[in-house]
């Protein structure tokens, strides 16, 4: 009798679990976003003397801990609070995305003279190294997106040649995709400033 009651209890519990499963919907797949790189056709010669064939290695790029998540972070501009959107994620680490866009932005501007920029993980010799420390990089749809970063340009042996701080904001579009697009444009503006600094460096010794 005891065995029968136990079997009935287990059967009832299993039925409840199966019934609950019928009403539970699986969590929706998150949307994935990637920081957009600049388009090559958007650039024209600016009349600045370029360093012929200059090679720049970008990295390390560091970000604050509050940004080091795959879920996209959105700031409430009124309450000055931030929140992670679990239904929207970066398709790569934010550090990798920032590095990629800066490399693309610099390469597009250095390419007319045969120059290029590449991540520090690439096994290539470089004339200069670019270190970037991101201090803030966030925003919200239909609100300002802010980028603040310290940077330094050094020789391959660590001698600091130039250093500075970039700080700018840009109004984002009404959707999350508009915020991501604004983040990409801010990085490209940052890349333009960095390239102007690179263009003032002495010719590299090889």
Annotate each predicted stretch with a short phrase.
Residues 1-22:
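Sec-dependent bacterial lipoprotein signal peptides
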Residues 22-94, 201-206:
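A structural "domain/chain start" motif
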Residues 24-43, 108-157:
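Surface-exposed short loop/turn segments
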Residues 52-54, 68-70, 86, 126-133, ...:
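Envelope-exposed proteins and targeting segments
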Residues 81-91, 157-196:
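Short secondary-structure boundary motifs at beta->alpha junctions and helix caps
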Residues 85-110:
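Structured, soluble extracytoplasmic/luminal domains of envelope-associated proteins
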Residues 103-111, 195-203:
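Sec-exported extracytoplasmic/periplasmic mature domains
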């Amino acid at each position: 009798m005891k065995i029968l009651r136990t079997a009935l209890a287990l059967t009832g519990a299993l039925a409840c679990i199966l019934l609950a499963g019928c009403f539970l919907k699986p969590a929706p797949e998150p949307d994935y976003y990637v920081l957009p790189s600049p388009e090559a056709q958007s650039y024209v010669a600016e009349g600045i003397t370029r360093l012929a064939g200059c090679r720049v290695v970008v990295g390390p790029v560091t970000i604050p801990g509050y940004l080091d998540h795959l879920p996209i972070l959105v700031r409430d501009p009124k309450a000055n609070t931030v929140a992670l959107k679990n239904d929207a994620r970066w398709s790569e680490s934010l550090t990798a995305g920032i590095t990629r866009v800066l490399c693309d932005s610099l390469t597009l501007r250095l390419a007319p003279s045969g120059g290029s920029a590449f991540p520090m993980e690439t096994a290539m010799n470089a004339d200069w190294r670019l270190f970037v420390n991101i201090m803030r990089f966030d925003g919200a749809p239909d609100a300002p997106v802010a980028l603040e970063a310290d940077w330094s340009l050094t020789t391959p042996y660590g001698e600091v040649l130039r250093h500075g701080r970039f700080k700018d904001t840009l109004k984002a579009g009404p959707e999350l995709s508009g915020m991501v697009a604004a983040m990409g444009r801010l990085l490209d503006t940052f890349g333009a400033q960095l390239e102007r600094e690179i263009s003032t460096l002495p010719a590299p010794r090889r």
